[in-house]
């Protein structure tokens, strides 16, 4: 199989690596991961806007998405909140001291398009009015924020190896905020459309507009969150979703949505720097040979203007060599073990919140396909013709994917929206080198120079990663020892990260360490 990265975004490049994996990798239980889907879905070139032109981005985002009919507004959602209350999830642990809600919000009544959400209110109950509302989005495109975000990363529970029992996550983000997880677009997870043609015309623009419509309708159901400080966070291809939704909020100028900041992790931001940074990471982490790295450097055109250059045989050959070198490791955390079996284990293995189980995807898939779980979540009410899956097999085409979101990030900063870009430093999928190169394209002056931050200040302290702050309220943060899904691998450090992001504070230094 021949794949090249010069004409496609980083996501497509790594899809080539995944599909080109050798027989040894195929014999393992391979996780379907965020970012593996764009090559399969993609049906059109990247959006044409160069990053220097915000006007081009404005033109794209205000154009009707992918020829899809204009959405028809749904009925006002007031009064539905109590019907969405989750009394208890099957297999839940003791001591649940926060409210949960889940259900559907219609975003297009004519198409019958509805998005599924799960809300874990802040610990302590009653949706603590002192804590903000935080929306979490996973990427893909086409991967579930319920399955990944809520059940494997930052949610209040994780699933044990029997696929039936939940255990508590002491570092869940609802210690810091009321956390809303959205499965988007329609066709992902439990979300659906009664117009099946919608599954073939998904894309960046339509996803942002549907997510905005979801928020607008959801706030009618939960009016206590109107005007509450609101933050959007996410990872991977949510590097597109998050700023694009924030941009839609600015354009619609809703008085009910008090957007304060966005935070994106191991995020797809800018095609050519994402791709260059990925191959730089492979070489600097001894994953590919000098010869392969030279072949990539000499024959693959990683520049802002080279991203659309036609494929060439020498670049293809070097890309194939990369795929062979990476076939037997987990590119999403290059130091993590692979899952060796997708079978459930009963009685369950004693879980460890600090040692992420690489087979967790299979436990979550089993749990979310249980009828009693779906009933508790008010999910699958239309009896979908497919099982719940972490990443959608229902979406058939992705019709627009921006080459860059840097101009949108610039626009958000001009509107005093806080922006944090964070990166787990063991991810090879959208690595820290990509994030650094992409942020550097903004050419921002440094406000506070690169330094370590500390996830613990006891004794000699514990370095959680590194941070550099730029003028205009943008911070670039690394998380030490974390892969693509940062809260999965470093949950404590991820909680410190989000707490300080929400507070608008710099991450802790260690000036007081020896006094503790």
UniProtKB/Swiss-Prot annotation:
According to the record's subunit comment, the protein's assembly and interactions are: Carboxypeptidase II is a dimer, where each monomer is composed of two chains linked by a disulfide bond.
Source lineage: Eukaryota, Viridiplantae, Streptophyta, Embryophyta, Tracheophyta
* InterPro entries, alphabetized: AB_hydrolase_fold (IPR029058), Peptidase_S10 (IPR001563), Ser_caboxypep_his_AS (IPR033124), Ser_caboxypep_ser_AS (IPR018202)
Per UniProt, the keywords (alphabetical) are: Carboxypeptidase, Disulfide bond, Glycoprotein, Hydrolase, Protease, Signal, Zymogen
> Can you give the propeptide residue ranges?
21-77, 342-352
Q: PROSITE patterns given for it?
A: CARBOXYPEPT_SER_HIS (PS00560), CARBOXYPEPT_SER_SER (PS00131)
Asked if the record carries the keyword Disulfide bond, the reply is: yes
Q: Name one GO molecular function term.
A: serine-type carboxypeptidase activity
Pfam families, A to Z? Peptidase_S10
Catalytic activities:
Preferential release of a C-terminal arginine or lysine residue
**Presence of the UniProt keyword Zinc-finger in the record:** no
GO terms under biological process: proteolysis
Which positions form S-S bridges? 143-391, 300-315, 339-359
Q: Which organism is it from?
A: Hordeum vulgare (Barley)
- Catalytic residue positions: 236, 427, 484
Posttranslational mods: The linker peptide is endoproteolytically excised during enzyme maturation.
Signal sequence interval, chain numbering = 1-20
Q: What is this protein called?
A: Serine carboxypeptidase II-3
Residues bearing carbohydrate: 194, 205, 301, 380
| Entry GO terms, CC | vacuole
**Catalytic activity, EC:** 3.4.16.6
